[in-house]
Every structure is written in C-alpha cells, then in structure tokens.
C-alpha cells in the first residue's frame, strides 16, 4: 500500500507511517494529477507489476482488486476500470450527472474501442505499459484522472477494459455533488473531454505477444 499525501496539513502521513504503510509526503499540493504521477513513478521505481487506484471514502472494496487483476490477465488489458454500472450492485446516478456519465460512456466506448459504462470511476488498475505511460504523461486538469487518462491510454494504443464491482455506502466525508454541482459537472466535464480529445497519443512499448 502506498499513501500519497499531497501537501496535506492533517495527520494523514503520520497515521499511515504509524500503521507501517509506505508514504510519499509531497511538500506542495500538486493536485490529483501530480499526486497520481508521483505514485506511478514510485510504482515503477520499486518494480510493481500493477498499481491500483481507489477512493478513500470506503466505497471501493479492496477485495475487488483481485477481480481487476484477473480481468487484466484474461483480457490482456493495460487499464481495467472497476465499473459501478456493469451488472454488479445497485449503484445509480440521477439528473445531469447521469446524463454526463451516459454521454461520456458513449463517446469513450468508441475512443477506447470497447464497451464502457463507468468512465468516471475512481477504481482502476494499471498494468506495466500504463505505468510507463502515466509516470510521465498524466493529465493534471479537471477529470484528468478519469476521462483524460482514458483518452491518453486509447490514443497511445493501450488496451482498456472494465469489470463490474460492488460499491459500498460512503464511510466518511461529504458527497461532492448536488443538483447545482451536478449541472456544473456536466458543463465542466464536457469541456474536459474536448480538451482530452484534442491531444495526440504517446508511443509506449508494444504489448507482449501471447504464447502460441
């Protein structure tokens, strides 16, 4: 387990260290993109085969990581999304947020050349080629860790897949959306998608060939 403390001013880093967890304590707040890039660089440096991103509010079950790894192996995928809408669990969205999610799933399914139902999921597994790409090319703007990262992966010819996961009730913190914020999310996310689609891809090492 790696905890990236993105310039936090609370006791997060101290509590994690006391529990015996590896900590990257960034001196400045770099935002989600910078913190994720630091985590990817750490994963490559210490030789991780996979890195898994999940939210800290208790909604994602770490026991589902094995499901994502199995999907990466069986589908030869570089990025695996843990989807809230792929037939496992009863999570659902409403209003403008749901409209935005449906729109992005429609567009990104075509960009990634696979059916995707949850493109804004914060539960993802990254394989070796994804780690190599994102260690130096990970978007820092709004929704870069979801929509932007998927566009970069697809444009760089990485294989993206998804698998259904169970979501749990939020264990802490406040929801980041309400009707007004959801409408704003629709506008901002559409702009973020347009920016992401305007970027070229990156060259990464080819995927290993399957055994005959």
Task: Give residue spans per PLM region.
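Hydrophobic residues within well-ordered alpha-helices
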Residues: 16, 72, 152-154
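A charged, well-structured terminal subsegment
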Residues: 196-203
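Catalytic donor-sugar/metal-binding loop of nucleotide-sugar-dependent glycosyltransferases
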Residues: 114-115, 138-141, 150-168
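Short loop->beta transition adjacent to catalytic acidic/histidine clusters or analogous donor-positioning motifs
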Residues: 1-2, 11, 21
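A conserved acidic beta->alpha catalytic loop
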Residues: 5-13, 58
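Short, structured coil segments at secondary-structure junctions
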Residues: 19-20, 156
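Acceptor/aglycone-binding surface of glycosyltransferases and processive sugar-polymer synthases
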Residues: 22-45, 50-52, 62-143, 169-189, ...
